[in-house]
């Protein structure tokens, strides 16, 4: 077993009184030097449960900078859907996340809070970390700003679910 390996097993029963969740996952703030990403999932562009028709399933590499979609009005962006594996690394060390069931991930220099509170992309301030999200599920993107709300089939409304994944940090030899 690798030193520091974490086998996460999160079982959830959502209270009916609780509002719908837009997403469920784990958010980590990692060393900003972990700037290279490699993943097996939908790519190379961002992809969501309702926005992946132009994406292909495969092995991709990108810098964290390139995973961010620079929309004029900041918003949720850069997620990669239907992943089995993601690795963030640099020349000395890295971290790997894998799972038997597909997950989504997002690696960015911007927090979700920063994206929500700013109205123009030039106002964004980078975090001191890589903001790394490993998600069991997210709502679809929809188009409520210029079209319909998220369709029911793309709404995350699970009441009982279990999210299992393995996280392995490593140092290159």
Residue spans of the language-model regions?
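Beta-strand/loop-rich accessory regions of lumenal/periplasmic or secreted enzymes
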Residues: 1-173
């Amino acid at each position: 077993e690798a030193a520091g390996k974490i086998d996460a097993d999160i079982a959830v029963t959502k209270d009916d009184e609780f509002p719908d969740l837009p997403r469920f996952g784990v958010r980590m703030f990692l060393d900003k030097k972990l700037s290279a990403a490699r993943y097996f999932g939908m790519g190379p562009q961002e992809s969501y449960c309702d926005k992946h028709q132009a994406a292909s399933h495969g092995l991709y590499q990108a810098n964290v900078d390139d995973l961010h979609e620079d929309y004029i009005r900041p918003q949720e962006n850069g997620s990669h859907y239907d992943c089995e594996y993601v690795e963030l690394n640099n020349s000395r060390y890295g971290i790997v996340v894998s799972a038997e069931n597909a997950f989504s991930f997002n690696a960015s220099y911007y927090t979700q809070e920063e994206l929500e509170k700013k109205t123009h992309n030039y106002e964004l301030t980078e975090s001191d970390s890589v903001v790394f999200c490993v998600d069991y599920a997210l709502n679809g993107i929809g188009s409520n700003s210029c079209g319909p709300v998220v369709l029911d089939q793309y709404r995350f409304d699970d009441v009982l679910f279990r999210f299992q994944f393995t996280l392995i940090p490593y140092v290159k030899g």
